[in-house]
Every structure is written in C-alpha cells, then in structure tokens.
Regions:
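Iron-sulfur cluster-binding cysteine motifs and their immediate structural context
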Residues: 272-273, 303-329
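Gly-rich Lys/Arg/Thr-decorated short loops/hinges at beta-loop-alpha junctions or inter-strand turns
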Residues: 23, 80-89, 125-134, 157, ...
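Active-site diphosphate/adenylate-binding microenvironment
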Residues: 63-145, 154
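Terminal amphipathic helices with adjacent charged low-complexity linkers/tails
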Residues: 1-68, 260, 264-267, 271, ...
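Thiamine diphosphate
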Residues: 128-261, 269-275, 281
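Short connector loops at secondary-structure junctions
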Residues: 28-35, 120-128, 194-200
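Hydrophobic alpha-helical scaffolding
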Residues: 2, 6, 28-40, 86, ...
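Short beta-strand segments
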Residues: 1-2, 63, 118-120, 162, ...
C-alpha cells in the first residue's frame, strides 16, 4: 500500500483486534512510508519480512541468495554499459492523439500570452511535463472544470480546463459541466475523447466504440452535453493542429460568455493498434493486401529549426549531424 497514512493496514488491524485475533500484521515496518513501490523495493520488503518471521516451508537461505543474485545481475548490466542511459521521463506514447492538442495550446499561448490551465488525472496529465509544461492544478479525476471555478474570477483571460472522456463520465459531467452551466460560468473545456480510460489500460467507458466499431448513440458525449444545456460545442480531430488552433482561438475570442466545449476526437493509438492488428492479420490470412503507412522527415524540406521537438516533443525523431552549413543538424 503506497503512501502514508497506511489506510488499509490500519483498517485491517482494527478488524483483527475487534475480532480478538492476535495475528501479526506487517506493512510499513518492512516497506517505506513514501515513494513508489518498484520491484526492487518490494523484493527488499519481502526479504526483510521473511528474515524477521522465518515462516516454515521456505528455504530462506536460497531466497536470500536469489535476491542477492538479482542485485548482482542488475549491477553487472549497469557496468556493462559504456555510458549511463539517458533519463526517460514519463510522457505521451508514440502517436498519442493528445500530444497535438497540447501543441495547439502552446501555439495559442504564443499568441495570447499565459493562460490558466486546469489539468486532470489521465494520460493528458503528461502535458504538465516538457516541452508543454501546462497545468496549473490537478485536483481530482474529472475535477478540472470544477477546480477552475475557484480561480476563474481573478483571471484576465478565459481559463482552459482539460479532462478525458473517462474523467468526464466519472465526475466531470456532474461536478464540472452541470455546475458551470448552473452558475453561468464563462470557461473553456477540452474533452480528450480517445474512447477509453487509457491511462489505466484502455478500459471501456460509456462512450467507447463497440465490437462492431460503432459508438452507442445513447452514450455519446455530444448528446450528454446538449442534454444539460451546452450551447457552444465543437468537435475537432486531434491531429488537425491548425483546425484545433483556430477553434481554440475562436473559443478565447467569442462574445458568447457561457461554457465552451471542444471535443478533441482521436482514438487511443495503443488501443487502435491492437484493434487493427487483428483485422490486418485476418485480411492477410485471406490473401488480401494490407498497406501499412510509414512516416519520415523529408531532408530536402526540413529547415532544422526543431519545431517538431519544441512544439510536440516528438518521440520518434533521432537527431544526427548534417553536412549542410545552413542547418544545425
């Protein structure tokens, strides 16, 4: 149980004592109070627990040797590298449909200046990292629009709230959209419609497409928004950065002073790849032709200004030296 206080441990302890059971309970005595429980941390905790209690039926010496060999193998792998591996901070997946949306917001900020952005829990929370660095707050799952209400009155520009479609169904529709409509809030909401709760493994949500690649009409986000009184609403394909920028600009400048919702539509690329992989395999088995697109950089057109890195942090690029004196690389 990561974090402190150890809620589950305390509750189980109370249950045991109320039942007058003297069963020993271990948790934070062998695991750290803070930090992420990585594999190394869990192994160390288990070794400490078994060393203290020495349960029957377990060859403790063999277990300790195994743990030591794991640590040795890790050290050997590190020493085998000529240089330390570069840090790999968390970020959007390759091809993620949400990355271009943040590129559009970045371009918007270059035009209008700083904007208060209320972030949310989900894949889009990676927008708080470089090269975007967007998100003044993250309050809770589906709470971005509700949290923006607390600062909206002191901002010189309209606030932008970002939430995923999973967060929208979980909490955003009630606490955010309904509340903003009721209080006549003048705000902008971007809903990342990727079709799943992607950050936790592409679980299905009410607006997910079904097995026939069709969306259930009664559970569409657009219909839900209209039913609660949203008047200003646009749906934009996430990869169309120019259209997204134009729509964001319109939302910032329009005279309409109610809630403005932009649905950024783009299926989670991981889920899409898994889905079409089965379809392509079936077509190949039937002897049909399957075309797989490939993308690259045209060296004759590229100016080497690194806009692809500065604006989107594209993870698929590799920079190499160039013989062209007019370009850095």
């Amino acid at each position: 149980e990561e974090g402190n206080p150890e809620f589950i441990e305390q509750q189980i302890g109370q249950i045991l004592r109320r039942a007058d059971l003297q069963t020993k309970l271990h948790g934070k005595d062998v695991l750290p109070l803070s930090g992420e429980y990585t594999a190394d941390v869990v192994v160390k905790g288990l070794v400490d627990f078994l060393s203290q209690n020495k349960p029957g039926g377990i060859d403790l010496e063999k277990l300790l040797d195994q743990a030591a060999s794991m640590e040795t193998a890790k050290d050997n792998a590190i020493n085998a590298l000529e240089e330390k591996l570069p840090a790999r901070p968390p970020g959007f997946c390759t091809g993620c449909p949400e990355r271009p949306v943040f590129s559009a917001i970045k371009l918007l900020k270059e035009e209008v200046g700083d904007i208060h952005i209320s972030a949310d829990i989900g894949c889009h929370a990676f927008g708080t990292f470089e090269p975007f660095s967007m998100g003044n707050s993250i309050l809770g799952y589906g709470m971005s629009l509700a949290s923006a209400a607390g600062v909206r009155q002191i901002q010189k520009k309209r606030t932008i709230s970002i939430m995923g479609d999973g967060g929208f169904w979980h909490n955003g529709l009630q606490s955010g959209v309904l509340s903003t409509i009721f209080n006549k809030g003048d705000a902008i909401l971007i809903i990342m419609q990727n079709g799943y709760s992607s950050a936790t493994g592409q679980q299905f949500i009410p607006s997910s497409i079904n097995m026939n690649n069709e969306q259930t009409a009664s559970n569409q986000i657009e219909k839900a928004l209209k039913s609660v009184g949203v008047k200003w609403m646009k749906t934009v394909r996430t990869y169309s950065v120019d259209v997204m920028l134009k729509t964001l600009r319109e939302a910032m400048e329009t005279n309409y002073d109610g809630l403005k919702v932009i649905i950024a539509d783009g299926e989670c690329m991981l889920a899409r790849q898994r889905r079409i992989k089965k379809t392509n395999a079936k077509r190949l088995a039937e002897g049909q032709k399957v075309a797989i697109p490939r993308f690259g950089v045209d060296e004759e057109i590229c100016t080497g200004d690194h806009s692809c890195i500065r604006l989107s942090g594209c993870p698929s690029l590799t920079i190499k030296p160039t013989s062209d004196p007019l370009r850095v690389d």
